[in-house]
Swiss-Prot record:
Taxonomy, superkingdom: Bacteria
Name used for this protein in its record: DNA-directed RNA polymerase subunit beta'
Gene: rpoC
The record's free-text note on cofactor binding: Binds 1 Mg(2+) ion per subunit.
EC class of the enzyme, as a word: transferase
Catalyses which reaction(s): RNA(n) + a ribonucleoside 5'-triphosphate = RNA(n+1) + diphosphate
Species this protein is from: Borrelia duttonii (strain Ly)
Binding site for Zn(2+) 2: C777, C851, C858, C861
GO biological process per UniProt: DNA-templated transcription
Amino acid sequence: MKEIKDFEKIRIKIASPDQIRSWSYGEVKKSETINYRTLRPEKDGLFCERIFGTTKEWECYCGKFKSIRYKGIICDRCNVEVTHFKVRRERMGHIELSAPVAHIWYYKYIPSRIGLLLDITASNLNSILYYEKYIVIEPGDTDLKKMQLLNEDEYSEAKERYGMSFSASMGAEAIKTLLENLDLDELSSKLRLQMIDKDDKTDKKLLRRLEIIENFKISGNKPEWMIMDVLPVIPPEIRPMVQLDGGRFATSDLNDLYRRVINRNNRLRKLLLLNAPEIIVRNEKRMLQESVDSLFDNSHKRKVVKGTSNRPLKSLSDALKGKQGRFRQNLLGKRVDYSGRSVIVVGPELKLHQCGIPAKMALELFKPFVIRKLIESEAVFNIKRAKSLIEQEVDEVWQILDNVIKEHPVLLNRAPTLHRLGIQAFEPVLVEGKAIKLHPLVCHAYNADFDGDQMAVHVPLTPAAQAESWALMLSTNNLLNPANGHPIVFPSQDIVLGLYYLTMERKNVMGEGRKFSNFNHVLLAINNKSLDYNARIYVKVGEEYIKTTAGRVVFSEALPGKISFVNKTLSDYELQTLISEVYVIYGSSIVIEMLDIIKELGFKYATKFGCTISMSDIIVPQEKKVYVEKANREIAKIQNDYTKGVITGEERYNNVVSVWSKTNEELTNKMMEILKKDRDGFNVIYMMADSGARGSRNQIRQLAGMRGLMAKTSGDIIELPIISNFKEGLSVIEFFISTNGARKGLADTALKTADAGYLTRRLVDIAQDVVVRIEDCGTINGIKVEALKNGEEIIEPLREKAVGSYSIERIKSPITGEIILDVNEEITEDKIKELETVGIDKLVIRSVLTCEAEHGVCQKCYGRDFSNNKPVSIGEAVGIIAAQSIGQPGTQLTMRTFHIGGVAQAGSEDDKIALKNAFILNGLEGFNVQVDGGLLFTRKGVLRVINVIYEESIKKIKKLKVSDSQKVIKGMSLFIDKSGVEVLSSHIGYIKIKDNKLMIVSEEQEISLKVGTRLEINVGDYVEAGRVIGTFDPFAEPIIAEVKGKIKFKDIILGTTLKEEINLETGNIEKRITDQVFESLDPRILIINDRGVEIASYVLPGDAYLQVEDGQDIDIGDIIAKLSKGSEKTQDITGGLPRVNDLFETRIPKNLTEMAKVSGVVQFKAIQKGKRLINVIDEYGVEHKHYIPAGKHLLVRDGDVVRAGDMLCDGRINPHDVLEILGGISLQEFLLAEIQDVYRKQGVSINDKHIGVIIKQMMKKVKIVSVGDTNFVYNQKVDKHAFYEQNKRVIEQGGEPAVASPILIGITKASLNIDSFISAASFQETTKVLTDASIAGSIDDLRGLKENVVIGHLIPTGTGMNLYKRVKVRENSNSEV
């Protein structure tokens, strides 16, 4: 069989009986395998040489022909062809079945494919196939119906009654006849008519049936091929039988399964020849069906066939499925030769592009190269001799090895390979010993440390592979993190500590205050020991003297020439910033040089500093006692309020946790202050934390402050804090509480790592075929981006979101009118600076989400490749990079819990509103009432404020150059002051002149207010920075009276909707609305006036605490009822990772909110079946119904005006609702924001475009709403591009196009619905995917990476793209590349 390498596509179909026979080289008639005496295969058996080929090379079975010269001759005695024994891997046989048999994939898997075609239920189909019931094939002129099932008695009765005028049968024969008689075209049109009749209420079964029928029609498969008359036998080398040491044999399970089939088949044949009784024949047929089922899929059956030692046998399906199956074990994850692994140790003397390989390992890895050189140098003349020289390890061998490995890169890999930086290329350097030496700065990319980690080495062999290793994979070409473009090669730990020590400043040390005219003099003074590294000195730089320290001079002097003087204390953050800046300004070559210098300086001065920790370095603040006493007093007050019944149990708990969190924070601040002052900032513990070398504020707090609150395993916080720290030692109870958190940490780590790994796998699978394929897709759509702010605080600047993208619109300067950015121009760092200067902070950019490339994405929509800060090149596998960028931090984050040791991470809740900067209150929104001279918000509200960025008294101004409300930008003239100096603006904003002040103010911002907020200011007020303007209760949401009157209870019945509980701790009676839902009861509180007329009504949600009595008088602003917030949980990505999972899988959240479907006015209706009906009446007066579970806390009241997409009740948002109500763009923004929120909280930076790539893949399909004149089926899910294509064709022919709505599919489902059946089959549900693909006759275009890896092609990205396939690497000379 010739090798097939050059093919573009692969197709899978159902094999017809003729096709199976044409593959076969002969029929297997006996179940014997090999002869026990001769150990040669038996004739006509499962290993027969006549069928499958000879077992001995170029020799027939009987030995008549023994030589290659008889190649191709068939022996006349034994009928065995003289050929190579490798044909036993390719040649197939077959078994002629004595009775037809159904294929388990097509009848057993849900939904049963045969069942759908014939419209028979799975259980009925089973009973026919297993010879329990008859099915009527032709009713003739009887009362029977076609396809009617008859049991034994009914059949006998019908036989007696009608004789031969009808035909009924059982088993696979009956099903085969029915399938042969199917008219697919007629059936298809019949079902389409049924679908149109049913319209919206079409059931899934109809759609499934139609899809299967269409698939059969398109593929050319015949339905009756799902029933087999002939069974293929796979080649014997694939189901081998090998002799073990003790003379026993080990055999593949498949041989046992085949043996059972053959035995039963032969027995059935004999019985049929003997005309045996029907009942015996039927039983044998059933057994044959069973044995064929277990051959194809043993694990899917109820009664599994077991072999020796009671182990289920592995069938053909099992060989494909799962992690140990053919796809994942052998095709996607192969073991590689020319590789080795060993423990890693640090190699501080290496350059960034080098790694140390143990000499012995290198000799083994490069053996073939060494042998070649030995023969070339004529030291030996054959390979055998060369091998023995290598074993003796003579000197010549080492010399040759040295030459061979020069400039021959090797790849180093550390498992788990979470992102592409887990494999990098290095130039090998031979080292003594048996450990691989690794450069300390690449550890971060590998996430490696030297506590026993192992790494694998791989040798790229071909010149092309070596060239790619040098050009693309060398560690010096991988300085940036592809997830966000920040440097990933940066110093940490010892290096940081050394440089921090070197660049710190210290008072009163040798040489303080001296002046030096140049750097060399400083270095001389240090060498002569007349100057301390940390001394403050003055050095001439350029024309002037600058104040610096000797150490900083040493550092700057060592850096490459171009880099300007660095005059600050270097912490890890400062070093990363420095590396980033140097990369942007000077490029990678200077950075690489600088990194090696930084590494050497860091290690050198860390050694000189020689820091050690002693108990006296851990300083416990004297004030600790005061803080703890204050906290205890506050807690006593909270307890007192609780005892009086003023607050509920949940509020008490939340308040206690909040007090301890605040206390801990205050104590930590005090402790850090003390440590900073200790020894002029040279306290070692403080230095380690401040420099970022080791440890964190959190860990020091546990050493010298207090351990604080701990979390239970459930995530709840234990309200009893650990007041001691590790220096003082823990009491027994404190130690016991501690163990809880520590154990949680370890258990979480183990479980969550697997979760994160699985997330990565699903992400890779959905995005693996997203490759940059074209330059420009020509779209005119884009997405809006702006800086992400929380109030005035910028969380993520515009730069992070827009740099490296392309603009979709032309942007002109608002002042000069010049074009700053043109359409389709790249947004660079400089362009962003220009835009910021003129005050533009919103852009519309091209994005992967709006890219219209048919396959993958285009260069312009993707923008910049973060791994090298250049525009992305065609052929870049951006999908996989996106998946790795999202998955890799997931794994890192799961391990985060465990380092803090389970200390609870709950912030203390604020109960005040105060802004960091001065502002003017511009307006209010939301229902509020006047109470005690302030405003009380009875519902959620919004403050509209303008921040004051700059202010100056009018009295100091001589001449004003600007007017009220004018926009100003940086550098614009504002005024001339009394001394005649022109003052320029250093801000962007608008001029406001008020209260004799000239101010620059920002654009209006919104601040949301909770229910029950009390506001102390009025519209138009100027408020100075930090002033408290309002207060609220952070732990409870009140329901507040908005009118004055008398309370009247409605549907509040004790024991039904109201329960009274006596609190055992306080003895108070708590009145609480139950959360049970009653059909007709709707608990409410009415307020009535003097005449008894209802003037207000308040719906009470479940779990609300009543604060009033029936008939009581009430005033405006009084609290009617309270809803407690749930107890504080500690926030950790343990909560975050499942959240990311849910978003990517588009799961419907448990506690769902209902969103308004349209904008309009809310109208409350009665409760029906435990759900409250709320109508939203739109502008045309149309009512849109919303059903909300009774007992949910409503966020709207009768008569409120809502916008489409507003939440009507408490709960989580369902992404599918967002798509339906607000459309695709809003959904993309929602998913992006939610996913980013989880990562941002953990301090992980991932660029939006990576998440965008995944979301794009989730929104690839649309659902057909109206069929028009297309071939689509109503409710079918189809690919967007296929939909547009077919519509285009139909419109051109003058037909009516189909209409579809966008849908969102979770990543697992989307991976299984992918175009490539090979990729889908190797992901999950292998047999199901292959079953459907074979019916549809699917063609795999081999576009993605995975399918090409499976079939052994180069992946179609980078240098493997079709563009480059015709390019050949040629050597100039005969020497090795």
